[in-house]
Structure formats: structure tokens, C-alpha cells
Amino acid sequence: MKKSLALLALASLFIGTTSCRKKDEPKPAPVVSTDPNTTDASADVAAIKNSQAVLTVPAGSVVYIEPQTGLKILGATMDATDKTKYTVGTNGLLGINGNVEKLKIQSDDITNLSLPKSSPLLKALILVSKSSSATATATAIDLSGLTDLESLLIAGYSIESLDLTKLNKLKNLGIGAWNLGANFPEMTDAFGTIPEKASRISEVKLPANNVIENFIMRTATLQDGKCDFDNLPKLKKFFCQSPFFSNFTFAKSTELEVLYATAPTAGIKLNADLGNKPKLKDITFRTASLSKFAVSNATELVLKDSNADAIAVEFDNIPAKQAYGYITGRANKTVTSITLKNIAFSEANLVNLINKLETRNGTLKVKGELLTTAVNAALAAKGWTGAAL
């Protein structure tokens, strides 16, 4: 009898342990679906609002959604011929559910977009207007659930404040869009070819510990202090069209390789006080004016495509040919302060550089031994003075 009771107790323990183990086992990971998209136009409001993505739009408006597989669309009907085109029902709500790696949403009419739920398979989100100008209605966006997102492009919308603070894995960020072609293959790989679209995004809040590597920006309303460009420690490439902000300093971006900016809004002078940028290979400022242009330790730097002038130039440990070419070919008509450190200039180089200056009452700062009689004479002829470093 005792033996039977002992066996029964042992069996109960085994069964209980097995049951606990099954209960504690993780749920199967979601997989990308390849089934064609389906719709439920009659879904109730509660079901739509419980979706992974919820859009608020005027009733009867059209939203374009890609991909054509892996999604269930609630509150809308699919077009009979264009399988990316959905017409929203009378309640003005559209829900998106499913497991896809890239989601693209196009509409001029979204007033609210919410993605508060975890979507671990979603790596890229593209939200763009159909029109090329920023005529889309002012939009509120909640992306707090996309903690695994790696690529985000938002363009063609008016957004007062865009909160990306939860997106700690984001590597590719596009605020506004224009066709970069072969200049930025990382963005083309992430988003495909997106036509030029104006945007009015006035503030961008980045994750404190962000890992953003590639950043494009084209927005007409973002001013200084509305995006922390000085906290981009992993940044490699930055492209900007028509900036409405002036500070291009990128204080923590010591990994920066390429910097491109063109046509500042309202003729704003840019402050390109870049500091130590040892990996920077290409700086291009076009159709722009710089209040200050300073960079150091960029030993492979190329400046040949920059046509921006500058008032103050400070170069430290960059190629002498690039420094000479920029100052004599672009900055010579506006510059009034030049500082040259750790650059292999000869006396003849300096005299030739000074002779090409077209401004007066400026200051040249170089090593004391370079302020030779010939250099000082050339400076005096231009109304400039020399100062020893």
C-alpha cells in the first residue's frame, strides 16, 4: 500500500512539473504572412480601435496601404483592381493588423495615426502623403509601440511634434523626402524611391540613447532647439534640404562620414562648427552661407562640391589642398577670420592664399614661424593682420 501511494505521489509530481513547464514555455514567435490582404468593412469601432495600427480619416476618403500580403484591414473596402487602395467607411476609422516587415501608408487625409502595440516583425514604416506639397491635414502620431522599428520615413504632413523617444533601435530616419538617387543608397534600400515631398514637422524628439546612422531632413518649420542634432553618437550620413535651423554642429557625431545641406530657408546663415570629426570624408554645403565653418582631424576630407561662402573658417588637421581650395575658391569674398592649425602650408602657399582674398580687416591665425616677412607683407596689402597660435 505504501509503495502504491509513493508511486502515485511521484506520478502527480511529474504531471504537475510537466504542466508548469508547458505553461512557462514562450509563445511561438510571429512569422511574416504571405497570404493576400483581407478586409472587414463591417468591423465595429471597438475592433478597429484595438488594431495594431489605427488611422482616423474623413469618412469615404482613400488610403493606400502596402504590402498586398499579410494584412487584415478593418473598416474599409479594397478596390477591385488596385489592391493597395482602400476606401474608408462611414465611421472614419481604419484598422491594420498583421505581421509584415515593411508597412507603407499613403493618404492626404490622416488626422491621427496610432501604433501603440508591439509589432516585433515591423522593421520599416513609411508614412507619406499622395500629394507633393505639405497639404495633408495636421496629424497627431503615436509610435510608442514600435520599439523594434529600424527605419522610419514621414513626409508630406504637418506635425507639431513628432515623438520618437521609444524607438531605440531606429537606424534610418527620414523627416521629409526628396530623391537622393545614388547619393544615399542606405535610404533607398530602406524606403525605395520616394518622390520629393514638402513637410511641416516642427519638432522631432529623438531617443536619448539613439542609434540613428542615416538621417535625411526636409521640413520647412523645424527651428533650432526643436531636434537635438548634438546627440547623434552613431550618425554616419546627414542630408538636409532647405533647413530652417542654423546649427550644424553634431557635437557627439564622431562617426560622421558625409554631411550635405542645401538652400537654407529664408537665407539663414549656417553655423557649421563641427569640431572633431575624424571619419568625415565629404562636406557639401550648396547655395548657402556659413557664419562659421570649423572642422578638425578630418584627414580624408573632400570639400570640392561645397560652394557656400563663410565669414569665419577654422581648419585643423585637414588636407592642405582642400583647405586652400575652399578658402581661395569659395570663402575668399566673405571671410574675415581664418585659423589654420596642423596643416602643411608653406610660405608660398600662404602668400598665394592671402593674395586671393577679396575682403579687408580680417585676421589670419597660424603658427608663429609662418608669419614671415613675405606673409606679413601680403597681409598688410589686403588690410589683414596676422596672429600667432
Where are these regions (language model features)?
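Low-complexity intrinsically disordered segments
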Residues: F14-I15, P185, S296
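N-terminal capping/linker segments that flank leucine-rich repeat
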Residues: C20-S131, D142-T147, K166-N168, A177-G181, ...
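Detector for repetitive beta-architecture
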Residues: L93, K102, N112, A124, ...
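Generic short N-terminal amphipathic or hydrophobic helices
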Residues: F14-T17, R200, V211, G267
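Bacterial Sec-dependent N-terminal signal peptides
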Residues: M1-A29
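Canonical position 11/12 of the leucine-rich repeat
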Residues: D108-T111, S131-A140, S158-E160, N179-M187, ...
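Solenoidal tandem-repeat scaffolds enriched in leucines and small polar residues
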Residues: G174-F191, A208-R218, G225-L232, K237-F244
